[in-house]
Amino acid sequence: MAQTQGTKRKVCYYYDGDVGNYYYGQGHPMKPHRIRMTHNLLLNYGLYRKMEIYRPHKANAEEMTKYHSDDYIKFLRSIRPDNMSEYSKQMQRFNVGEDCPVFDGLFEFCQLSTGGSVASAVKLNKQQTDIAVNWAGGLHHAKKSEASGFCYVNDIVLAILELLKYHQRVLYIDIDIHHGDGVEEAFYTTDRVMTVSFHKYGEYFPGTGDLRDIGAGKGKYYAVNYPLRDGIDDESYEAIFKPVMSKVMEMFQPSAVVLQCGSDSLSGDRLGCFNLTIKGHAKCVEFVKSFNLPMLMLGGGGYTIRNVARCWTYETAVALDTEIPNELPYNDYFEYFGPDFKLHISPSNMTNQNTNEYLEKIKQRLFENLRMLPHAPGVQMQAIPEDAIPEESGDEDEEDPDKRISICSSDKRIACEEEFSDSDEEGEGGRKNSSNFKKAKRVKTEDEKEKDPEEKKEVTEEEKTKEEKPEAKGVKEEVKLA
């Protein structure tokens, strides 16, 4: 399968400003706020100029029941913190309550996460983008009738079902530290979806993903599991990921790829035990992108939220084939990234328990399984079912140039490289970074002493205007789908 290096591809990105408001509860490791932090960081890096940004629609119950059972989705729609006592039996039945708590706006959170992934799949199907990104998606543990591992609705399965309307074969790759059990289970008996998961195995949630789990029936050999031990580093991960994925591409020949980019496989994750850097993690994105296939990039796990934001911002830049500086731009959550205020992280000194012999042995076993695959299966394509989302109306070329264009249309426009000056320094004084942030703190008190009250008033007004700018920009980017 042809590989290309550094090809610029069209990218669209889904984000809803409300997603950061949802709260699983005190002490719970899953924090949707990390999606807002990611969005704010990539805005301040200026990445929004190079891609189309959409606000996802809220997926409805009908869309969700394309995979999930009716009674499970009905339960998720009905349950609230104030009526939990009426649902105690169902909570047990659907595994809701501990890891997967009931919180305010639970169903709306699922709607946004799912809406972004399904809309991304529709965009890819219509060839309106090459890469679609939804960092609020990637909730890979949810089952047909059960919540699991902080996941309630499996947006990945629903997005893959949408892709299968147009694509004969879809490849799913999971680089979260946890096994992608919910997605594997959904497609365990089909040869149209291959699931490939690299994960920690052995006394670790969810406890599945053994090397010998290879699929069943028509799906035999279409589930690929690479069980790993603690402490895997960039070098070892790259040494297994590239050859395995090359062989998978050669044997399966997919026409679309879904990549779950769970960042709990990074060094220093609150729940993880791997030792990958952001660059090592992103090498997987880069490699999959090089096959030049329609690609859906999703979030997933990630519990040290400052590193989640760093990782997904950098991987958005990789998708855009854009280099961004290691020095973080000033942003709404700047203090989270101290004391170094840098984009990239260093690995720890933990031991890599994955010996070369162990990794080689697993790799050879997987190659043997992949050799058992028949040549890429042919599928008799039938009439294409209706898209999950109605087509957007209006042709930009036919619009009257004298009329003001809608916010939706203007936000879909991508700026040409030459349209802006080389400098990203917006506003007087330039874009703030760590050094002038610290300097500003030092001289603040001296400045205040010197200024007369009238001058102070003027400065306050100016600062107020500057502070409002990024927020306005963020709102501008959140576009409603037609």
UniProtKB/Swiss-Prot annotation:
Chain positions covered by the region annotation Disordered: 390-482
Ranges of compositional bias, category Acidic residues: 390-400, 417-427
Lineage, broadest ranks: Eukaryota, Metazoa, Chordata, Craniata, Vertebrata
Top-level EC class as recorded in UniProt: hydrolase
The protein, known as: Histone deacetylase 1
Record note on quaternary structure: Part of the core histone deacetylase (HDAC) complex composed of HDAC1, HDAC2, RBBP4 and RBBP7, the core complex associates with SIN3, SAP18 and SAP30 to form the SIN3 HDAC complex. Component of the nucleosome remodeling and deacetylase (NuRD) repressor complex, composed of core proteins MTA1, MTA2, MTA3, RBBP4, RBBP7, HDAC1, HDAC2, MBD2, MBD3, and peripherally associated proteins CDK2AP1, CDK2AP2, GATAD2A, GATAD2B, CHD3, CHD4 and CHD5.
Record's comment on post-translational modification: Sumoylated on Lys-444 and Lys-476; which promotes enzymatic activity. Desumoylated by SENP1. Phosphorylation on Ser-421 and Ser-423 promotes enzymatic activity and interactions with NuRD and SIN3 complexes. Phosphorylated by CDK5.
Modified residues (N6-acetyllysine): 74, 220
